[in-house]
Amino acid sequence: PLLPYTTLFRSRLDILVNNASVFYATPLASLTEAQWHDLIDSNLKAPLFLCQSALSHLRATQGTIVNIVDIHAQRPLREHVVYGPAKAGLAMLTRSLAKDLGPEIRVNGVAPGAILWPDAGIPEKLEQAIIRKTSLQRAGEPADVAKAVLFLVRDAPYVTGQIIAVDGGRSVGW
């Protein structure tokens, strides 16, 4: 029911950014089915069905979809046996939708790296270890992700099916 409210407010839909996500560790030994559903539903299922709900509106406006993926869609994060595969699924969904929805709708993704730390926090030593693995030697800002999304939406009319890493160069040195 989100889309009817959105289109009622503005009467058209040009852009869908799938940014909602759940992130937490799921070690295999203690993984529950509820955790599986929580992570898959928020990181893969919800974006798919939001795209489906927005389809006719985005076709009418030659709109664009941007999915917020994660650099860990390509390289697993220890003890996150569900999150990584969910984001990898979102990366493949991004490419599949680009193939299926063109030429009317462009579909791309942005894969953030160290931008915001988990709500529960992580030890300072771990933060610094992650930052040392980036070429730019610093964490990013939410504005860095927003600028990449804005580029894909506004300045990239010939780009579809791509996922831009916004990770300070971390994925270069995996």
How would you label these PLM feature ranges?
Residues 27-28, 35-40, 130:
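Substrate-binding pocket helix/loop in short-chain dehydrogenase/reductase
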Residues 29, 75-81, 137:
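Active-site loop immediately N-terminal to the catalytic Tyr-X3-Lys motif
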